[in-house]
């Protein structure tokens, strides 16, 4: 199989494109050509590194261009320059008691306070994404909006490659204005949780339709309540309960379904004890950071911000076992989904995934690295369709 040639997507610090070889080995990185159209970097961005393009049979991973949002966020991410707390308090007055100047004179909140974080999310969804109501029950994960919407922006770029230009025109990638929008794009969110954040943002930003699945009836009931209180979401998001805790796609994807992409933020801990240690570590890091900046650190036992139910935080075998099950099941539905994707929190889990993707016959594998402040998040994407099938899929969709 000839390695595909394609440019790096915008905003990613590193893009590794891989296409399985004919031999029984792990996927090989494919070559990439230089991007001709790059979004303009913002003033605080680092100098951009040139992409490499060497059409060799065996190529090394290619460094994509470092793009310009101040936090390393995608160029289309609205939150690259921080939060406008004055505007947020105007839309959500309940947030005001939790906002205060930090030692540098900038407005902020205590991110260890679950009430403050939840109200910040509500304000962001109201101000930037046109939602009037959003809430989660106590004890469920409260997702950071900037990082969640970043995942969607990268997926939009991935879909853009399968969207032909209008009237036979030649597309130039990366083309940040060509990300497919509208209800003909259908996505499947695995493990949507009680917050339903990916379907909510995906519809409000790109107009995509979503199927959201979860193993927890309480979570789906809460997402149903969010939909009911935002009339613009009626008929755009459908919910499906996974009745088998050992299955991911099986029992959710139906024979008539066609998904442009699947997405998932998998549970990354292997046990409740491991998840609890992770929460304690985050709280200690926040407290240490506050002391270093001169903030008063209050003693509190509340951990909702780093809370979450079992299905949200951990599963037997942890992230690696979950991803392995997802990859094996995806083979069964390979002709029904254009792209399968998942976040990967631990870099060491990538190699086992590459080997398994080779075994199940994935035609192409992508690894995207997204920088969000000091945090590095990876998106693993794979497809069982050929480039020709991708083109036909995009042509049929648009």
Curated annotation (Swiss-Prot):
Region (Disordered) location: 1-85
Gene Ontology, cellular component aspect: cytoplasm
Biological process terms in GO annotation: rRNA base methylation
Location of the protein in the cell: Cytoplasm
Protein EC: 2.1.1.181
Pfam families xrefs: Methyltransf_10
Principal localisation: cytoplasm
Bias kind Basic residues: ranges: 1-12
GO MF annotations in UniProt: 23S rRNA (adenine(1618)-N(6))-methyltransferase activity
Domain of life: Bacteria
Record field: compositional bias (Low complexity): 20-40, 48-59
Catalyzed reactions per annotation: adenosine(1618) in 23S rRNA + S-adenosyl-L-methionine = N(6)-methyladenosine(1618) in 23S rRNA + S-adenosyl-L-homocysteine + H(+)
InterPro entries reported for this sequence: METTL16/RlmF, rRNA_lsu_MeTfrase_F, SAM-dependent_MTases_sf
Keywords: Cytoplasm, Methyltransferase, rRNA processing, S-adenosyl-L-methionine, Transferase
Family: Belongs to the methyltransferase superfamily. METTL16/RlmF family.
Function: Specifically methylates the adenine in position 1618 of 23S rRNA.
Protein name (Swiss-Prot/TrEMBL): Ribosomal RNA large subunit methyltransferase F
The species this protein was found in: Shewanella loihica (strain ATCC BAA-1088 / PV-4)
């Amino acid at each position: 199989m000839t390695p595909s040639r394609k440019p790096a997507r915008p905003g990613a610090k590193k893009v590794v494109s891989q296409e399985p070889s004919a031999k029984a080995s792990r996927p090989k990185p494919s070559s990439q050509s230089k991007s001709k159209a790059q979004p303009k970097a913002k003033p605080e961005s680092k100098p951009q590194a040139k992409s490499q393009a060497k059409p060799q049979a065996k190529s090394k991973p290619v460094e994509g261009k470092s793009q310009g949002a101040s936090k390393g966020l995608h160029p289309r991410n609205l939150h690259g320059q921080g939060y406008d707390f004055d505007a947020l308090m105007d839309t959500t007055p309940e947030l005001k008691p939790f906002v205060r100047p930090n030692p540098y004179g900038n407005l902020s909140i205590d991110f260890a306070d679950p009430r403050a974080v939840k109200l910040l999310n509500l304000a962001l969804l109201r101000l930037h994404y046109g939602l009037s109501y959003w809430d989660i029950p106590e004890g469920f994960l409260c997702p950071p909006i900037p990082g969640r919407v970043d995942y969607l922006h990268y997926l939009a770029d991935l879909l853009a490659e399968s969207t032909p230009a209008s009237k036979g025109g030649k597309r130039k990638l990366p083309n940040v204005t060509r990300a497919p929008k509208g209800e003909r794009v259908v996505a499947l969110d695995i493990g949507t949780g009680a917050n339903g954040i990916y379907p909510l943002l995906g519809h409000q930003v790109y107009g995509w339709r979503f199927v959201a699945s979860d193993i927890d009836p309480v979570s789906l009931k809460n997402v149903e309540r969010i939909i009911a209180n935002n009339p613009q979401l009626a008929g755009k998001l459908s919910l499906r309960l996974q009745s088998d805790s050992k299955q991911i796609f099986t029992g959710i994807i139906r024979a008539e379904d066609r998904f442009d992409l699947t997405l998932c933020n998998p549970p990354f801990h292997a046990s409740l004890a491991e998840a609890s240690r992770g929460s304690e570590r985050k709280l200690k890091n926040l407290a240490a950071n506050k002391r270093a900046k001169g903030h008063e650190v209050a003693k509190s036992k509340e951990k909702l911000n780093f809370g979450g139910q079992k299905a949200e935080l951990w599963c037997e075998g942890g992230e690696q076992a979950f991803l392995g099950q997802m990859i094996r099941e995806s083979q069964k539905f390979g002709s029904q989904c254009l792209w399968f994707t998942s976040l990967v929190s631990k870099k060491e889990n990538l190699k086992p995934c590459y080997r398994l993707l080779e075994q199940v016959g994935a035609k192409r594998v992508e690894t995207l690295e997204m920088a969000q402040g000091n945090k590095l998040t990876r998106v693993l994407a794979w497809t069982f369709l050929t480039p020709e099938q991708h083109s036909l899929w995009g042509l049929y969709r648009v």
